[in-house]
């Protein structure tokens, strides 16, 4: 078995890499150790949240461009497949409950006008006294008003992944239930004993990429990144699909289509049971119900836990592996991957085909490797 491009990992990043590769005519294979969308990408939240508009830099500009371009790409996937991705630019509400937060938010309003180019894009970051819909969020959560961010959006993670998969099925060979084991001289071995000759291999299997980097570059997995546990829940509640998502003190409340509301999430550096929910999620649910009384009595229909990849330098990790010119790492992203996966994937394909993509310096593998050396004192 052979291909131009082998993608390791069937999450949102891997699917977008495969889609861009197929669109460019590359013979592509995607392998996934479990099933496509079974990892962190197949969660519940689907929040597409911009960075703060102040202290503008290349990373924030990259994300802004990605969030701005995503609606058109989602529509294209939906038209091709006939599947709904559950995308909506719903905006975000952030209650202000400290004077210091209100002062900072006022400065961010001006920054958004400039950096989000409000006069042309229409995207705003404004302070208002009352929410667009009474009780969303609760009045006692916002004694100083709230910020309304109109750039933020939401997408249904599982519907999105299903549509992306459908969009590539006729052009990409998808192999599920087989994991990456090793790669040497352009031949990848899978856990089922398959040997795949690949001109280029993309490592995009989330946190499971970090042990592979340790295997190929030396050192342990933690030298390159680590998994961070997140827990979330899905509630049943008939609410207006247009309601903005609410973010307050680390808690998200996101209305999705079909009478569902996603709530989350935890961010756990230490954990014993990575895929089990516990009292930490109960705490998040309690906060969410107080924050948005409309879901106070909404029944929980699903509890979810998963592991997100946090690279050593926190930002996405992209680059050709040292001494392995045919292997490209494409992982990380942590909490922002869903909103930028399509743009990162395009850059990765550019890199794999001899191009020179414009990426923030902090995204490059070389930057992460320097960060890792600095943190371990091996300057």
What are the language-model segments listed below?
Residues 3-29:
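N-terminal Rossmann-like FAD-binding beta1-loop-alpha1 element of flavoenzymes
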Residues 6-8, 196-208, 345:
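Short hydrophobic core segments
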Residues 16-24, 33, 44-52, 83-88, ...:
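Active-site substrate-recognition segment that forms the wall
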Residues 46-135:
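Dinucleotide-binding Rossmann-like beta1-alpha1 core, especially the glycine-rich loop
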Residues 54-55, 83-94, 120-166, 266-270, ...:
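Helix-loop-beta segment of a Rossmann-like dinucleotide-binding subdomain
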Residues 61-67, 99-101, 147-163, 275-279, ...:
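Short beta-strand to alpha-helix junction loop
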Residues 173-187:
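A conserved short coil-to-beta-strand element within the FAD-binding core of flavoproteins
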Residues 298-379:
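C-terminal catalytic lobe of FAD-dependent flavoproteins
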